[in-house]
Regions:
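Conserved N-terminal structural module of periplasmic/extracytoplasmic solute-binding proteins
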Residues: 2-108, 301, 325, 409, ...
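Extracytoplasmic/periplasmic substrate-recognition and gating elements
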Residues: 68, 167, 248-249, 286-348
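A structural signal for short loop-to-beta-strand junctions that line the ligand-binding cleft
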Residues: 100, 127-164, 304-306, 376-385
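Hinge/lid segment of periplasmic solute-binding proteins
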Residues: 105-154, 208-210, 215, 293-295, ...
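Extracytoplasmic/periplasmic solute-binding protein
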Residues: 146-150, 155, 177-230, 235, ...
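Conserved C-terminal helix/tail region of periplasmic/extracytoplasmic solute-binding proteins
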Residues: 165-166, 249, 374-425
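Glycine-centered hinge/linker elements that transmit conformational signals in sensory
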Residues: 183, 226-255
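Long, aromatic- and glycine/proline-rich binding clefts that accommodate carbohydrate-like moieties
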Residues: 292, 344-390, 425
Length: 425
C-alpha cells in the first residue's frame, strides 16, 4: 500500500477536548470515563516520512471533529512508526491494554486469537457497500470480513531521468539484465549515486522481496495457498540479486539494514537512480525537484504483468465492548472527505468507490494514472492466512540476509518457520 506530502495542521481546539482527542496517547486501552463518556483508543501507523507530515496531525484532526459531533465519545490517538507498531501492539494485547481501533498492515493473526469484531458489526451498511469489493474480499478469513481496507497502493519502477541522461540511458529497463546493465552504466558514469536502491531492511522487506520473486514466477505462496518461501524460483531470485546487484556494488552495501524510508529519501534527494516505489514517492520526488519517470517493474525476462498491491487495514477489537461507539467513529472516518484527505496527503490509492470516482474524474491526479492502471492486475500478500502476520514478521527480520549469505539456507530457515506457524495455528 505507494507511500506516501501536504502537512495537515492539527485542528485541536483549546481545553479538555483537545487534551483528550489530540494527546500523543499512552499504552492503555479505551474505557468509560468518570463522567460517563466513552474514550476510544485508536492506534495507527505513521505514513509520514518526517515530523511535519506525521499521520498524527491527520488523526488528531479527525478525532477532534468526531468528538465535536459526538460529545459523548472521545478518541485517544496514538500514532506509531511502521518499524515499531507490530511490536507495540503485541505488547499492548499481551498486557491487556487492548486498543478499540487499530490501523496497521495486517489483521489475520488477530482473527486467529478471536480478538476482532466482524466488519459488519462495526460498519454501517452504507459504509460497507462503499468499499471496493476486491479489497473488502481481501479482508476476509473463511468467508467473514474482519479486515477493513483503509488505503491501497501498487508498485512500479521509479527512475531519475536526469541521472539516466548523464549515464547515456534512453529508456527504463524492462528486464533484470537490462536493469543490471543500466546500473553498471550509472555506477561508471555517475559515481557517488546508488544505481538501484534495494531496501531489504525490517521496515518492508516482505514487500521488496515479493516484487523480485514475482519477476521470476515465484512468490511467498503457491497456487494452493501453501508457503513456498524456499522454492527454486525464489532461491534463484536471491542468488541473482546477490551476484548481479549486491556483490558488484550496484546497490547498498548492506540491503538487510536499509529500510524503504531510506531508499525513498535517497531517491528524493537525487542520490539513487532507480527503485521500486509506490505513489507516496511522487510527492517526495517533486519536493526534491527530481525529474522522475514511472515504468512497469522489470522481471527476469520482461516487465511484470502483475505487480505487488498492498492494502493497509483498519480493525476493531472486542475486548472493551465499544461496538456501537466504534461503528460511529469508523463511519465518520470513512466519509469521502476524510478518506480523500488521507489519500491525497500521502499519494495513496483509495479503497472506497466514492473516493476512487472522485480521484479518477477530478483531473487532479494525473500523476497517479499509471498506478490506477496497475491496480486491477495487482497481486496481494496472503492476508487471509492467519499465520501471515507472523511469517511476514520473520521475513522482515531475516530475508535481507539472503543477499549476503546463502539464499537457500536463509529461505529454507524461513520456510521452516512458516511451516511451524501453520502447524501451530
Amino acid at each position: 500500500m505507494d507511500k506516501r506530502v501536504l502537512a495537515l495542521v492539527s485542528a485541536c481546539a483549546l481545553g479538555a477536548l483537545a487534551l483528550t482527542s489530540c494527546g500523543s496517547g499512552g499504552s492503555g486501552g479505551g474505557g468509560t470515563d468518570p463522567d460517563g463518556k466513552v474514550t476510544l483508543k485508536l492506534v495507527a501507523a505513521d505514513y509520514g516520512d518526517k515530523e511535519t507530515n506525521s499521520s498524527k496531525a491527520y488523526w488528531n484532526k479527525v478525532a477532534t471533529a468526531f468528538t465535536a459531533a459526538n460529545p459523548d465519545i472521545r478518541v485517544d490517538v496514538q500514532v506509531v512508526n511502521w518499524n515499531d507498531i507490530d511490536k507495540q501492539v503485541k505488547t499492548m494485547i499481551q498486557s491487556g491494554n487492548v486498543p478499540d481501533v487499530l490501523q496497521t498492515g495486517g489483521y489475520a493473526d488477530k482473527v486467529a486469537d478471536d480478538l476482532l469484531y466482524p466488519a459488519e458489526d462495526v460498519l454501517s451498511p452504507g459504509t460497507r457497500s462503499d468499499l471496493i469489493d476486491s479489497f473488502a474480499r481481501a479482508g476476509q478469513v473463511k468467508g467473514v470480513q474482519y479486515g477493513i481496507p483503509f488505503v491501497s497502493s501498487a508498485r512500479a519502477l521509479f527512475y531519475n531521468k536526469a541521472l539516466f541522461q548523464q549515464a547515456g540511458i534512453t529508456q527504463p529497463p524492462t528486464s533484470w539484465e537490462e536493469l543490471r546493465k543500466d546500473a553498471e552504466q550509472l555506477k561508471t558514469r555517475v559515481p557517488g549515486v546508488t544505481p538501484y536502491a534495494l531496501p531489504l531492511g525490517p521496515e518492508e522487506a516482505q514487500g521488496e522481496s515479493m516484487i523480485w520473486e514475482l519477476g521470476n514466477d515465484g512468490g511467498p505462496t503457491g497456487k494452493d495457498g501453501a508457503y513456498t518461501l524456499n522454492s527454486q524460483a525464489n532461491i534463484d531470485t536471491f542468488r541473482w540479486l546477490k551476484a548481479d546487484l549486491v556483490d558488484p556494488g550496484l546497490t547498498y552495501a548492506n540491503p538487510a539494514t536499509t529500510d524503504r524510508k531510506t531508499a525513498f529519501a535517497d531517491f528524493a534527494a537525487g542520490k539513487a537512480a532507480m527503485l521500486d516505489g509506490h505513489p507516496s514517492l511522487i510527492r517526495m520526488a517533486q519536493d526534491g525537484k527530481v525529474d522522475y519517470g514511472v515504468a512497469p517493474i522489470p522481471g527476469k525476462s520482461g516487465p511484470l504483468t502483475s505487480t505487488l498491491g498492498v492494502a493497509d487495514w483498519m480493525m476493531a477489537f472486542k475486548k472493551n465492548g465499544h461496538r456501537d461507539q466504534i461503528r460511529k467513529f469508523l463511519d465518520f472516518a470513512y466519509t469521502e472527505d476524510n478518506q480523500l484527505a488521507f489519500d491525497e496527503t500521502y499519494d495513496l490509492m483509495p479503497v472506497t468507490q466514492s473516493v476512487l470516482h472522485e480521484m479518477t474524474t477530478s483531473g487532479k491526479h494525473k500523476d497517479l494514472e499509471p498506478f490506477f492502471a496497475l491496480l486491477p492486475h495487482a497481486v496481494f500478500y496472503p492476508l487471509g492466512d492467519t499465520t501471515w502476520d507472523a511469517v511476514s514478521a520473520e521475513l522482515k527480520k531475516s530475508v535481507g540476509g539472503a543477499v549476503s549469505g546463502d539464499p537457500a539456507k536463509v529461505l529454507g530457515d524461513l520456510q521452516k518457520k512458516a511451516q511451524d506457524a501453520v502447524a501451530n495455528r
